[in-house]
UniProtKB/Swiss-Prot annotation:
Belongs to the PNP synthase family. The gene is pdxJ. It catalyses: 3-amino-2-oxopropyl phosphate + 1-deoxy-D-xylulose 5-phosphate = pyridoxine 5'-phosphate + phosphate + 2 H2O + H(+). It comes from Cupriavidus necator (strain ATCC 17699 / DSM 428 / KCTC 22496 / NCIMB 10442 / H16 / Stanier 337). This is Pyridoxine 5'-phosphate synthase. InterPro entries: Aldolase_TIM, PyrdxlP_synth_PdxJ, Pyridoxine-5'_phos_synth.
Length: 260
């Protein structure tokens, strides 16, 4: 099944980290995350997201440098709040940098950045990145204090952490987490922020989040890489974008893998 989606309704950022994870598992040069990014653009991705972690467990410095001049859309570079990463970002100058919390022992990002608790450090980082012409996003929980702190430190964009929504064990728990995200979207907009969201979203839980009209962009990676094993990379990207757009427009698309 080939999917086509209208552009401009809601943006899809395709995260290519786990293409690099697959490459690094065998120490080979394939699969190439650069090729994955360019094919994702052709399939309808509105931007490419990649996380340069301090331990370089998937994306490497060379990947970021090689990809930056080749993208036709936007690069959204995720990185920790360290001077090393800020300096790398200011050297490469992606269109967007999303500051995220990072712990070496975690499998994946486990929560939002504590902007309120690290206010001066975050504010200084926002100023450094903005001075290099980079738009700053802060990956935070859907918490009123964190959203207010993000606005106060000068970040124009927030990305709301959807991991607790994605990991909810019961419908009631998921409904509660969804309400928190929806309230966070409203709070972000009241502060004049662009509101994005991401983490843990996949083909059967993305619809309610994508339907929220205040969300500009969703960043999704692992689910697309996993689905591509069966559906093919470009069609996996097309399918995710089509599901998101259908949710925003109030229409329906077949579930992943369902017949047309």
């Amino acid at each position: 099944m080939i999917f086509h989606a209208n552009p401009g309704v809601i943006d899809l950022g395709v995260n290519i980290d786990h293409v690099a994870t697959l490459r690094n598992a065998r120490g080979t040069v394939y699969p190439d995350p650069i090729r994955a990014a360019l094919l994702a653009e052709q399939a309808g991705a509105d931007l490419i997201t990649l996380h340069l972690r301090e331990d370089r467990r998937h994306i490497r410095d060379a990947d970021v440098r090689a990809l930056r001049p080749q993208l036709a859309t936007r690069m959204n570079l995720e990185c920790a709040l360290t001077q090393e990463m800020l300096d790398i970002a200011c050297e490469i100058r992606p269109q967007d940098v999303c500051l995220v919390p990072e712990r070496r022992e975690e499998v994946t990002t486990e929560g939002g950045l504590d902007v309120a608790g690290r206010f001066e450090q975050v504010k200084a980082a926002c100023a450094q990145l903005a001075g290099a012409g980079i738009r700053v996003s802060l990956f935070i929980d859907a918490d009123a204090d964190q959203i207010a702190a993000a606005a106060a430190c000068g970040a124009p964009v927030i990305e709301l952490h959807t991991g607790r929504y994605a990991d909810a064990h019961t419908p009631d728990e998921q409904a509660l987490e969804f309400r928190r995200i929806a309230d966070g979207v409203d709070a972000g907009q009241k502060h004049g922020l662009v509101v994005n969201a991401g983490h843990g979203l996949h083909y059967t839980n993305v619809q309610p989040i994508a339907a929220l009209p205040g969300i500009k962009e969703l960043n999704i990676g692992h689910a697309i890489v996993a689905h591509a094993v069966f559906a093919g990379w470009e069609n996996a990207v097309r399918e995710m974008k089509a599901i998101m757009v259908a949710a925003r427009l109030g229409t329906r698309y077949p579930a992943a893998g369902a017949p047309a």
